[in-house]
Every structure is written in C-alpha cells, then in structure tokens.
C-alpha cells in the first residue's frame, strides 16, 4: 500500500475543519463554536475527560463563541469542567451569550479571558412549557429552581451578590470585554497570545 493511499484512508470522512479541531485537541485546546446542545455537550465532556486522563496536571483551554442554548447540556459541560482535576482556562471570543457566558465565567479563577471585541450577554434561563396544568406547574417549579441555582453559581464566580445577579439577568444584560472584567465574569482582557495558545 502506498503512502498516498494510507493518507487518503486516514483522512476519509474527515474534512479540513475536523483535522484542525483534532490538532487543537492535541494542544489541549477545545472549542465551543455553536449553540449548546446535547451533541456538542457530549463531545466537549468527552474531550475534557480524555485530556484529564492524559495529564491531570496540565491546563485545558476552552474557547467559547456561542449564543448559548440548552441549560441541561450546558450544565453537563459545567459539571465536567468542575469534575476535572485540570484547571480549565476559558476564552470568550465573538459572542459568549447565555449558557456561553455561564461557561465563560465558570472557568478557573484567574484563568478566565476575553478577547477585546468579544461581547458577553447574561440573562435568565428560558424554557418552553406545555402539557396539562399539573405538568406546567411541575415544569415551572423546576425552572424556578434552575434559575435560582444558576444565579447562585454566577454570583459565586463573579463576586456579585445573588440579588445583583438576579436583577441584572432579569433582561438581556450586555457587556463589552472590559465591562465583563469589571463585573467579574472574566479576569483578563487579552489582545494577543503570549507564549503558547494553550496553558
């Protein structure tokens, strides 16, 4: 078998973007560049677990450019970040909204970054409800619990009070990178990578 055939077989079913993400993964860089759903959450959780198993002492860098999405899928990513023995450095770029903002602020303290033109948006979680009156009441109770839990966690990560987070997230609250730093969502605004892109 020639080298060309081997290379063609190795790359079969893999497009250019797949090979870029594979290369980034080898550098301990993972990327959330879509809406948060179960599929991307499972992929990111698996990547965090893999990198944690390979070397539990080295940082993992999570780059976020996401409009948000599913609360349960996002919480799976968040819990895996906290479960990992590795520090998770988070980088907000482009847009980190809703669950994207939550994951950005949930990175390891001191290692949460925003690029200068990133926009960050915080708001309360939203959910569609339906069914019988009893079902709707149960869903409303679950939703209120989720809203409270997320506000408590954001308060813990930002240093803001629970009351302030509840007030500020009642409607869409937009931040520039610098405003996000002042609020406590990120620790640093960075314009260029100093040294390797991963920590």
UniProtKB/Swiss-Prot annotation:
<comment type="subunit">
    <text>Fourteen ClpP subunits assemble into 2 heptameric rings which stack back to back to give a disk-like structure with a central cavity, resembling the structure of eukaryotic proteasomes.</text>
</comment>
<keyword id="KW-0378">Hydrolase</keyword>
<dbReference type="InterPro" id="IPR023562">
    <property type="entry name" value="ClpP/TepA"/>
</dbReference>
<dbReference type="GO" id="GO:0004252">
    <property type="term" value="F:serine-type endopeptidase activity"/>
</dbReference>
<keyword id="KW-0720">Serine protease</keyword>
<dbReference type="GO" id="GO:0005737">
    <property type="term" value="C:cytoplasm"/>
</dbReference>
<dbReference type="InterPro" id="IPR033135">
    <property type="entry name" value="ClpP_His_AS"/>
</dbReference>
<feature type="active site">
    <location>
        <position position="123"/>
    </location>
</feature>
<keyword id="KW-0963">Cytoplasm</keyword>
<dbReference type="GO" id="GO:0009368">
    <property type="term" value="C:endopeptidase Clp complex"/>
</dbReference>
<dbReference type="InterPro" id="IPR029045">
    <property type="entry name" value="ClpP/crotonase-like_dom_sf"/>
</dbReference>
<comment type="similarity">
    <text>Belongs to the peptidase S14 family.</text>
</comment>
<protein>
    <recommendedName>
        <fullName>ATP-dependent Clp protease proteolytic subunit 2</fullName>
        <ecNumber>3.4.21.92</ecNumber>
    </recommendedName>
</protein>
<feature type="active site" description="Nucleophile">
    <location>
        <position position="98"/>
    </location>
</feature>
<dbReference type="GO" id="GO:0004176">
    <property type="term" value="F:ATP-dependent peptidase activity"/>
</dbReference>
<dbReference type="GO" id="GO:0051117">
    <property type="term" value="F:ATPase binding"/>
</dbReference>
<keyword id="KW-0645">Protease</keyword>
<dbReference type="InterPro" id="IPR001907">
    <property type="entry name" value="ClpP"/>
</dbReference>
<dbReference type="GO" id="GO:0006515">
    <property type="term" value="P:protein quality control for misfolded or incompletely synthesized proteins"/>
</dbReference>
<dbReference type="Pfam" id="PF00574">
    <property type="entry name" value="CLP_protease"/>
</dbReference>
<comment type="function">
    <text>Cleaves peptides in various proteins in a process that requires ATP hydrolysis. Has a chymotrypsin-like activity. Plays a major role in the degradation of misfolded proteins.</text>
</comment>
């Amino acid at each position: 078998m020639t080298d060309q055939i081997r290379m063609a077989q190795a790359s079969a079913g893999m497009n250019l973007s797949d090979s870029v993400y594979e290369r980034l993964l080898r550098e301990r860089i993972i990327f959330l560049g879509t809406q948060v759903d179960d599929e991307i959450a499972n992929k990111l959780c698996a990547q965090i677990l893999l990198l944690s198993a390979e070397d539990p002492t080295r940082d993992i860098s999570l780059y976020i450019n996401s409009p948000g999405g599913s609360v349960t899928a996002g919480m799976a990513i968040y819990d895996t970040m906290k479960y990992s023995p590795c520090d998770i450095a988070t980088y907000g770029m482009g847009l980190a909204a809703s669950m994207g903002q939550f994951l950005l602020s949930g990175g390891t303290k001191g290692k949460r970054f925003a690029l200068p033109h990133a926009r960050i948006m915080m708001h309360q979680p939203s959910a569609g409800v339906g069914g019988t009156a009893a079902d709707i009441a149960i869903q409303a109770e679950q939703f209120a619990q989720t809203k409270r839990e997320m506000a408590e966690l954001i308060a813990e990560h930002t240093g803001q009070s629970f009351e302030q987070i509840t007030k500020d997230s009642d409607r869409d609250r937009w931040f520039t990178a610098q405003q996000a730093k002042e609020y406590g969502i990120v620790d640093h605004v960075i314009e260029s990578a100093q040294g390797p892109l991963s920590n």
